[in-house]
Amino acid sequence: MWGLEVLLLLPMASFALYPEEILDTQWDLWKKTYRKQYNSKVDELSRRLIWEKNLKHISIHNLEASLGVHTYELAMNHLGDMTSEEVVQKMTGLKVPPSHSRSNDTLYIPDWESRAPDSVDYRKKGYVTPVKNQGQCGSCWAFSSVGALEGQLKKKTGKLLNLSPQNLVDCVSENDGCGGGYMTNAFQYVQKNRGIDSEDAYPYVGQDESCMYNPTGKAAKCRGYREIPEGNEKALKRAVARVGPISVAIDASLTSFQFYSKGVYYDENCNSDNLNHAVLAVGYGIQKGNKHWIIKNSWGENWGNKGYILMARNKNNACGIANLASFPKM
């Protein structure tokens, strides 16, 4: 046991022994890699202290992972100078309506008779567009919604097109644009509006603008939506297998999520009652004995595993992944 304790202290000791030589070089390299600039020396110092704290967390976690404590690894990325609280505040955006309740009219009834395949990956089927970056705009709900619509468009027409999250940010009056929103509100908008523009017709700018929807740029329509029974991962698995990519909501508030790199993500501190981020389930499978969901995020390809994360499946609805799952009808 003493050996483990000594090992766990090694990363902390290395930071204490080489505060200037090692950290200065790594800090400069990180700033150059991600083109970071700061308004003042004071601002840079405060950001560096956050970065150092995150780097220590990553180092210790990965040591524990090498000893079998965790099923996933972390890595420094472009969010290195942000706290987890700042990430949630600036880069998530899920807002569930206070009056939200499921109705029988929109409830998805799975086909329990036929067996779902052991694994599915819609990236390999051509249902998934490239990873996008929402930037510091609380528009995760728009990217999640667009991803589900893109999958259904591919399924129906055979064509994969980038649809416009900015169209949703600007035009879904029931949501709050970069201030946050909810996926079923987006699906309802597309249904009532009789369409959503393509990304080419209505490009993403990452801030709230006036609604500029143009029917000539319309690329997809929607006939409504269905919601997965709350907290039911088996129903979610059936939906992913039978329907396509599904919009889901998760708790993305932990530092472990912020710096996820590879492996199957499971953090017992992830709170299924604290849903703050919308993402897209594009498949599921198993890696080294660990069942997982394949999740597409909207924080760019520099985050996670080229923009994706494998999240634990069938582990008591980890991170609340099956609590607010839905998809559009097309």
UniProtKB/Swiss-Prot annotation:
GO terms under cellular component: apical plasma membrane; aryl hydrocarbon receptor complex; external side of plasma membrane; extracellular space; lysosome; nucleoplasm; nucleus
Active site: 140, 277, 297
Gene3D superfamilies for the chain: Cysteine proteinases
Residue ranges of the propeptide: 17-115
Locations listed in the record: Lysosome; Secreted; Apical cell membrane
GO process terms (BP): bone resorption; circadian rhythm; collagen catabolic process; negative regulation of cartilage development; proteolysis involved in protein catabolic process; regulation of transcription by RNA polymerase II; thyroid hormone generation
Major location category of this protein: other
Keywords: Cell membrane, Disulfide bond, Glycoprotein, Hydrolase, Lysosome, Membrane, Protease, Secreted, Signal, Thiol protease, Zymogen
Leader peptide range in chain numbering: 1-16
Enzyme Commission (EC) number: 3.4.22.38
Superkingdom as given in the UniProt entry: Eukaryota
Disulfide linkage: 137-178, 171-211, 270-319
Keyword Signal assigned: yes
InterPro entries listed in its UniProt record: Papain-like_cys_pep_sf (IPR038765), Pept_asp_AS (IPR025661), Pept_cys_AS (IPR000169), Pept_his_AS (IPR025660), Peptidase_C1A (IPR013128), Peptidase_C1A_C (IPR000668), Peptidase_C1A_papain-like (IPR039417), Prot_inhib_I29 (IPR013201)
Reaction equation(s) it catalyzes: Broad proteolytic activity. With small-molecule substrates and inhibitors, the major determinant of specificity is P2, which is preferably Leu, Met > Phe, and not Arg
Function summary: Thiol protease involved in osteoclastic bone resorption and may participate partially in the disorder of bone remodeling. Displays potent endoprotease activity against fibrinogen at acid pH. May play an important role in extracellular matrix degradation. Involved in the release of thyroid hormone thyroxine (T4) by limited proteolysis of TG/thyroglobulin in the thyroid follicle lumen.
Sequence similarity: Belongs to the peptidase C1 family.
Entry protein name: Cathepsin K
